[in-house]
A protein has these predicted regions:
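Cyclic nucleotide-binding regulatory domains
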Residues: 23, 33, 48-109
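Cyclic-nucleotide recognition modules
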Residues: 31-32, 82-140, 144
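Cyclic nucleotide-binding regulatory module and flanking cytosolic helices
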Residues: 2-46, 89-90, 94-96
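Polybasic "coupling" helices that flank or enter modular domains
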Residues: 126-193
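Residues that scaffold the ATP/ADP-binding catalytic core of kinase and kinase-like folds
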Residues: 71, 92-93, 123-124, 165, ...
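Phosphate-/nucleic-acid-contacting segments
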Residues: 169-234
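Alpha-helix/helix-capping structural signal
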Residues: 65, 88, 119-120, 186, ...
Length: 234
């Protein structure tokens, strides 16, 4: 269920939007006009459902700002697939595949999401080679990242996978050695296929070894070299 705080149509938002700028080209006025007239920006609060598994996909969805988690309900339990940082497209394989959302996406922070008419987006792909190429690159990078996470989950121990998560938050998501965990320890355990007790124990060990400092949900990485070694060898 959506808990939408506001919906608005922005006449000039598309000119400077990263959705356009990331394609490394200046779209023609006709294309910009088509985007301006066929999109809606929705603000979601932390915890709101952006995409729900099993529902019909009718729009291209672009995360303009904020953080979200991608998760799927399997035969036995719900599995967190990955954490998504803006700017990023959400659910493109579903939108251009069988049109039924194969996973859910939930906001981990307040987030602005752009819903773009799928037919207009298809036209942009056909008319703009550079834009189409940027979308292909996005999909390829996402797939390679999924392969890497899958290999790590199955071949690394919990200690190494937890180090990966902390390094990912530090280097990719927050770009800082001091950050607040956007997910609970239970969610971290789900993300790395471990138990909450193991996550809690490993975090305590990392604090005891002065590799990290933890105050509530705030993490400060004190010894990144050691954390990287744990990631590589554990």
């Amino acid at each position: 269920m959506y808990h939408i705080h506001y919906i608005c149509f922005m006449e000039n938002e598309c000119n400077n939007c990263f959705c356009n700028a990331k394609s490394a080209l200046t779209m023609c006025e006709k294309c910009i006009s088509a985007l301006n007239s066929n999109h809606a920006i929705v603000r979601f609060a932390k915890g709101d459902s952006i995409i729900k598994q099993g529902t019909y996909s009718t729009n291209v969805i672009f995360l303009r700002n904020g953080l979200a988690k991608m998760h799927i309900t399997g035969p036995s339990y719900e599995q967190i697939i990955r954490i998504v940082k803006a700017p990023s497209y959400l659910g493109l394989p579903t939108t251009f595949g069988n049109h039924i959302n194969q996973y859910s996406i939930t906001a981990l922070s307040d987030a602005d999401v752009c819903f773009i008419d799928i037919n207009v987006f298809r036209s942009l792909l056909k008319e703009n080679d550079e834009f189409s190429y940027s979308i292909i690159l996005d999909l390829c990078q996402s797939e390679l990242e999924s392969f890497r996470h899958c290999a790590n989950r199955t071949q690394k121990q919990a200690r190494g996978n937890l180090a990966d998560v902390l390094l990912d938050f530090s280097d990719t998501i927050y770009q800082s050695d001091i950050f607040t965990l956007p997910i609970s320890q239970s969610e971290i355990s789900n993300l790395i296929d471990s138990s909450r007790e193991s996550v809690s124990r490993i975090l305590s060990e990392l604090c005891k070894d002065n590799i990290i400092k933890m105050t509530g949900k705030q993490i400060e990485i004190l010894n990144k070299k050691s954390l990287i070694l744990i990631s590589q060898n554990a």
